[in-house]
Amino acid sequence: MDGIWITELAPGEGRRLAVKDLFDTAGIRTTYGSAVFSDHVPAASAEAVARLEAAGWVNAGKANLHEFAYGVTSQNLHYGTVPNPAHPDRTAGGSSGGSAAALALGLVEGALGTDTGGSIRIPAACCDVVGFKPTFGLVPIDGVFPLAPSFDHAGPMARDVLGCLTLMRGLVPDFAAELDSFGSRRVAVTWTSDAVLAAAAALGEIHEVAFPTAEDVVPAFMREVADVHRELYDESGDLYGENISEKIERCLAVTDSEYAEAVAARDRHREGAEAAIDGFDLLLTPTLATAPPPADVVELDVRAELTRFTFPFNALGWPALALPFGQESVQIVGRPGDDRLVLAAGLALEAAL
């Protein structure tokens, strides 16, 4: 299991935490999954790491990831491909694959991940664990290497929803110690599957809606990636892995007009999304549009498919929880600020199982 790349478990009374190697950790090598930063040792920890350590979590080590968090398979040419302990012939997902794998193996009780297009929820779905992307900006990303800043989220991963809730209490001051009783809700469903319909029925009154996808927003994401990497790639591009260099080149090629069109598309996406769930409490979708691909898949061949149901909520900044339900992973989505409601729905869904 070398590809998970987590250090020996640290001693201590606290719960063990795997920290995605995109988060700075004081005095501990932090590579961002790249050879460019192979000797990088930060002086200070990311704010999210510091908050969890202050809450009693013990950093058990750094978890491997797709290089610079730009990929959905955690195939890392420098530090090894992350294996999938739950389904060894399948990808662990990405980019927070090491965090999900460490949980699936039972190495830790909680993990930190980041999510720019699905990078918490996709590996959670692939490895049969739980991942939560909070409302944009709720969990600080200070000290986290950026991918596309207006899409970037940090959040918790755990083996159950209660684990994610416990982590959120450490990550966000004054996050509710207890959630309100869930009760029956009006639940919108889209891109439906049997698991989604069954999950929605367990939560309340079901209504199928047409929800917009966000393919037209992707060039805005790509321009932000280009802005982050432009200077670094010019200086150290020879150290980038081949499977990320190709994507960086594509990002650098996005024109001003393509970017402007994508920004306008993002505004339309937000308007369409808000209209689609008007009058509903929650939205349920599958987490993945397809089964987890084979472990040796070419990442670019599956990237669009694996992010189809996750990326729209990065473009929106809405909270989204991925959790196992039967043989699938379902995604519970709420409006901005409804993080507690989303987690309460997740707890109710787990209880229904």
Question: Which residues does each predicted region cover?
Answer:
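Gly/Ser-rich catalytic serine loop of serine hydrolases
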Residues: 88-100, 114, 118-119, 123-124
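Glycine-rich, small-residue loops and helix-cap segments
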Residues: 165, 171, 260-353
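Short helix-loop capping/hinge segments that flank enzyme active sites or metal/cofactor-binding pockets
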Residues: 14-32, 220-267, 274, 324-331
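Acyltransferase
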Residues: 193-210, 230-235, 259-280
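Short, well-ordered alpha-helical
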Residues: 1-41, 45-46, 66-71, 292
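Short pre-catalytic strand/loop immediately N-terminal to key active-site residues, enriched for Gly-Thr
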Residues: 35-43, 80-95
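Gly/Ser-rich, acidic/histidine-flanked active-site/gating loops
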Residues: 17, 25-26, 153, 169-222, ...
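Structural helix-boundary/capping segments
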Residues: 50, 105-188, 193, 315-353
